[in-house]
């Protein structure tokens, strides 16, 4: 038994399942999870001293790479002044100004401590502003673990084989309507059934919790039009995509203007941060200026704000996003070329600094939750563990996107694609493809 395995056994005695977030338990791929001791640049290092090229990036935030010197120094400087005040600081004002400057649809923003808090609060605000109870989400999209959102959710819920969760009363779930991602007709039919009851649509603009499914042309714009037609708000959940796929998020990349936006991950620089913001007229409904209550002891935490500001400022470097997109494209297209070489049925997707790969014989572009659930999980599990043995760390679930960082250089890309080629050669023999 190696040290990671021993730590996992020890953890299971005191932590449910041995982990503090379900996907980390490796249930989707089998075996024991790696316990990580440190990370630097494009690499993570486990408790046994093994080094891996990392394509998880703490599930998205580490867009500059791990342990970036500017972010680390910003945190060290902030710690000198104390860890938490529970009072306003100049740092949170600067952070709000930075977010508003980088996301044109946001006129005011409220800081929270997680993506779940951000989506939960944005939905409460939408309900309060419209005086309507129902929300509309999409099958396979994940927006955190708030009760109203764990209905046909993606990501960890899919990995566990549970489209929803026990512990959610039917009275809560009945207000959550579920449509088909990339299918405007399914959305319109729900609006026509409940024309005056839907407060908002909430969606991931790139569905990153059923792997990586981009919107088809016109889908986001169609949702904007339906919200306008039926008097609902459009909430774009950019917790994952915000500053990951483009400077102004996926909404800037695809040219759609939401009423509210949720953020997280990248804006924290690796620290626990979430945010929700939008039009001033809507945001004024949040306490203390309005009747919709939201609060948090650690909201706007000075250490988190310092880390986030350092990362956001670094992201303004000219040419950064085109360079990140080019790296991501090389990995995705390189994987596809290797798969074709070895007759491995594989489909790929990529946008900005996110990518997805799917072991499927479906020749159509990957656009739906239904397609993802039909992918070959046996192939994925084999590929996952073989890549791990080659020193490449991918998300341990077929329902999670991959992430690159600016720290992934020529050597890392070349080593990764060499490993992919080697593993696909193994798979061709192992599965008689």
UniProtKB/Swiss-Prot annotation:
Pathway: Porphyrin-containing compound metabolism; protoporphyrin-IX biosynthesis; 5-aminolevulinate from L-glutamyl-tRNA(Glu): step 2/2. One of its GO terms (biological process) is protoporphyrinogen IX biosynthetic process. Its EC number is 5.4.3.8. Pfam families: Aminotran_3 (PF00202). Keywords: Cytoplasm, Isomerase, Porphyrin biosynthesis, Pyridoxal phosphate. One of its GO terms (cellular component) is cytoplasm. Homodimer. This is Glutamate-1-semialdehyde 2,1-aminomutase. It comes from Shewanella denitrificans (strain OS217 / ATCC BAA-1090 / DSM 15013).
């Amino acid at each position: 038994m190696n040290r990671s395995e021993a730590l996992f056994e020890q953890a299971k005695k005191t932590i449910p399942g041995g982990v503090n977030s379900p996907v980390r338990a490796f249930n989707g791929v089998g075996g024991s999870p790696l316990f990580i001791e440190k990370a630097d640049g494009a690499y993570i290092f486990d408790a046994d001293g093994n080094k891996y090229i990392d394509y998880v990036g703490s599930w998205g935030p580490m867009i500059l790479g791990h342990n970036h010197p500017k972010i680390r120094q910003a945190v060290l400087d902030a710690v000198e002044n104390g860890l938490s005040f529970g009072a306003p600081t100049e740092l949170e004002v600067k952070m709000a100004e930075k977010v508003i400057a980088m996301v044109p649809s946001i006129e005011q923003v409220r800081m929270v401590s997680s993506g779940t808090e951000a989506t939960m609060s944005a939905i409460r605000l939408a309900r309060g502003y419209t005086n309507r109870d129902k929300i509309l989400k999409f099958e396979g999209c994940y927006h955190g673990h708030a009760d109203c959102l764990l209905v046909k959710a993606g990501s960890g819920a899919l990995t566990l084989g549970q489209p929803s969760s026990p512990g959610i009363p039917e009275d809560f779930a009945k207000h959550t309507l579920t449509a088909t991602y990339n299918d405007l007709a399914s959305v319109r039919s729900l609006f026509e059934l409940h024309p005056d009851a839907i407060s908002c649509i909430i969606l991931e603009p790139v569905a990153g919790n059923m792997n990586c499914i981009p919107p088809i042309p016109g889908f986001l714009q169609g949702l904007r039009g339906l919200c306008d037609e039926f008097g609902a708000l459009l909430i774009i959940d950019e917790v994952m995509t915000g500053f990951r796929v483009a400077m102004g998020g996926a909404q800037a990349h695809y040219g759609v203007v939401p009423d509210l936006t949720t953020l997280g991950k990248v804006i924290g620089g690796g620290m626990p941060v979430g945010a929700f913001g939008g039009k001033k007229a809507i945001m004024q409904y949040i306490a203390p200026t309005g009747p919709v209550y939201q609060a948090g002891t650690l909201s706007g935490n000075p250490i988190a704000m310092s880390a986030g500001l350092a990362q956001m400022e670094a992201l303004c470097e000219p040419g950064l996003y085109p360079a990140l997109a080019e790296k991501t494209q090389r990995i995705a297209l390189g994987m596809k070329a290797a798969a074709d070489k070895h007759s491995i049925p594989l489909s790929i997707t990529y946008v900005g600094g996110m990518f997805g790969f799917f072991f499927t014989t479906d020749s159509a572009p990957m656009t739906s939750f239904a397609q993802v659930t039909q992918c070959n999980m046996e192939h994925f599990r084999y590929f996952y563990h073989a890549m791990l043995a080659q020193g490449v760390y991918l998300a341990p679930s077929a329902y999670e996107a991959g992430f690159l960082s600016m720290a992934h250089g020529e050597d890392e890309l070349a080593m990764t694609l060499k490993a992919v080629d080697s593993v696909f050669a193994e798979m061709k023999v192992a599965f008689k493809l």
